[in-house]
Amino acid sequence: MLAKGARVSNSSGSFLGSRATLRPAHAVAALLQLSDDRYVMQLRDSNPTIFYPDHWGCFGGAVEAGEPPALALVRELEEELAVTLSPAEVARFTEFSFDFGFAGDGIRLRTYYAVRLPRADVDGLVLGEGAGLAAFEPERLLAMPRVVPYDAFALWMHHARGRIASASRGARDPA
């Protein structure tokens, strides 16, 4: 569902022409699943000062100075969805590093947490930030053209985690 008055840009690359300054930061993101295994995603605002505006992405955000990442995610989910969780209810899944040395900056981490919401339905979630929210089956979500690419990769890893775990233990692919 989209927030009241929200609209998605039809131009498939308009954000690429923006001259707005982007400010990389350490960040956290939720691989947020409902009991039916759909992933809950945020339609990002059209603000040109954020990475991938007008794209579907994971809920989450910047880690504040001195803040543990798990607590940052708990805070962000409260702000963005009015969901109250404890750090014990979020499980670290993976972490990506981004090297912004080309811009005179350093490494920035994006830490992904698996979060199950068995007691929630997407209709019961309250959007506090972003242009919209929706729940998607993994196959549909990963086939969509306007998904934040690094979030899409983390979602694919989460969805395929059983296959990846088997391969890392040395199992051979029968194909």
Where do the protein language model's features map onto the residues?
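Short secondary-structure boundary/capping segments
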Residues: 22, 31, 47-48, 103-105, ...
